[in-house]
Amino acid sequence: MEAAADGPAETQSPVEKDSPAKTQSPAQDTSIMSRNNADTGRVLALPEHKKKRKGNLPAESVKILRDWMYKHRFKAYPSEEEKQMLSEKTNLSLLRISNWFINARRRILPDMLQQRRNDPIIGHKTGKDAHATHLQSTEASVPAKSGPVVQTMYKACPCGPCQRARCQERSNQIRSRPLARSSPE
């Protein structure tokens, strides 16, 4: 009877009993592999060969790139020739120039454009003046007023020529209505 209990254990070969796959967990097995790989690639473990820390670009180079971006802020995509010129001025590789612009368009450019909008000298007008100016610039034939431009409604009408008259009649009706006031007098 004792032989029957030992039977399955005796069917394994001595090599299978002692193999790392049978006696160790997968994490231990991986560490064995990495120990074996560390012996062959010992050079990679030396401090001199570690990945270099990311450094900032030289301040003078960044200033040149920022100046170029500010001048071209509405189309901040330098051509290959412009990248080459910037590369020579900044002593940076074309790849670093391209990467700087990719990041700067996300990080710096929105601030540049926002700053321009907030500048009281350069920025946009606010309030009624801005609305009137906008209307003047978009529709030269209509005098600027602080209400909706109804005349352009039928011009942009998706209806065919037959129904354009109906749109024009509707716009005339809207124009003839008195404006509603928000506060009673």
Swiss-Prot record:
Region (Disordered): 1-58, 166-185
GO annotation, biological process: negative regulation of transcription by RNA polymerase II
Annotated Gene3D superfamilies: Homeodomain-like (1.10.10.60)
UniProt keyword terms in alphabetical order: DNA-binding, Homeobox, Nucleus, Transcription, Transcription regulation
Localization terms from the record: Nucleus
Tissues where this protein is expressed: Specifically expressed in adult testis.
GO CC aspect terms: chromatin; nucleus
GO MF annotation list: DNA-binding transcription factor activity, RNA polymerase II-specific; DNA-binding transcription repressor activity, RNA polymerase II-specific; sequence-specific double-stranded DNA binding
Superkingdom: Eukaryota
Start-end of DNA-binding region: 48-111
Homology family: Belongs to the TALE/TGIF homeobox family.
Function: May have a transcription role in testis. May act as a competitor/regulator of TGIF2LX.
Protein name from the UniProt record: Homeobox protein TGIF2LY
Species the sequence originates in: Homo sapiens (Human)
Gene name linked to the record: TGIF2LY
